[in-house]
Amino acid sequence: MVLVASNEMESYFGDLEKRADDCYILVSKARKAGFDPALEPEIPRAKDLAERVEAQVGPPGIAPRIREVAKNNGRESTALILAKELAGELRSEGIEVALEQAVRTSLSIITEGVLVAPTEGVVRVSTMVNQNNTKCAAIYYAGPIRAAGGTAKALSVLIADVVRRELSLDSYIPTPAEIERYKEE
């Protein structure tokens, strides 16, 4: 997407960037003086969705690919396409690494890299063993997932399903007791 702005607007945005850079330099100097437990500013600078996602959950170097896919797709489709790609690319690092990274990155795309849902709302993404000894995907949620909203929560399950298929994991098989409980509820 090409943005057109007047020279005055370009100058204004350039000035904002410079002032923000100056603030980060000042904060870094203050932090290094030892008056704060953290030595660096906690919030990384990011110019767009792709940079926010990469800074929030990674993996390093994913921002250009997010931009490329997002040019021709909506946010949800972009998340699903990248989930599948990441699962395939990271498979060699281990099924659980690929599963977790793909789910977190895709959820961050859906939540625009501004909510804590991908980092704090998803406690863990791993595999678990079904009652028939096959492996399936498991997502463990915490309270901050609520901030993502119902659509993002539901899409996180869809994303995990797309990733588990890419990683050749079986689907979850509920126990008879779980089935009965759901019928009752």
Which residue stretches match the model-derived regions?
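Extended, Lys/Arg-rich, non-catalytic nucleic-acid recognition/anchoring regions
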Residues: M1-E185
